[in-house]
């Protein structure tokens, strides 16, 4: 345990140095919140006395963007009920970072640079801060981009844009798309989701340019390393009315599933009109440590004492 925790501490220091050197400001927001974002199948643990433990600091960090901050990051605990396994833990550590005036392509570049800085590639340092703390060293990593529409056409045999089916989309993601991503190996960005799977992401407009998509898609990507999902990124939706509609639709879906009915965070919704353009990402620290230390179980990279 001592060896892994020392490596983890060095990795987290490396993450902080990367963002500090880029001019980001580290922030802290509340772990207990009153109004989680309503998302299907993501349940926040309730707190005695009221409120919930956060599944993500996303809404609170976007409020900071609306208050005038430009580049921010946060490392801290997050919680999800009912998630436990070799890659899941009810409590986990996340880093989220956000940029005003950016898109998901800017965050994509951030992530590539961060992974190289931390050691996934020939530029890796096999000692960190003078300590003998080896991390995984591989040849220069290959990063691939796979678009969701192409992935479903090629590996699932149907087009979610022409025949949307939420259950089928989720099932095929787990049984066909993610295994295909694992077979590619290395880093894979799964990009450009159907509008129905936009979550809190901005929708693109269909283009008439011959080299650009002629259909609308959510400016969203998820990143996998050797098949392990590591990060989820959006060009942020900054349209107040559209976000309210999506939240209300998600609340209705949660009611049908008999899941907790979270109150809406109107302070967040109203703040969107003061952001205009932004992008951000959530990345699992525990899973990143698993990758860099070649560890198979998430429980082995956390201090369970």
Question: What annotation goes with each model-predicted range?
Answer:
Residues 14, 24, 30-64, 71-100, ...:
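A translation/RNA-centric and nucleic-acid-associated enzymatic feature enriched
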Residues 130, 139-158, 276:
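Short, conserved secondary-structure transition motifs
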Residues 119-142:
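Intrinsic disorder/low-complexity segments
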Residues 100-107:
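Catalytic palm subdomain of template-directed nucleic-acid polymerases
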Residues 11, 15-18:
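Amphipathic alpha-helical segments
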Residues 108-118:
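Short amphipathic C-terminal alpha-helix that caps PH/PH-like domains
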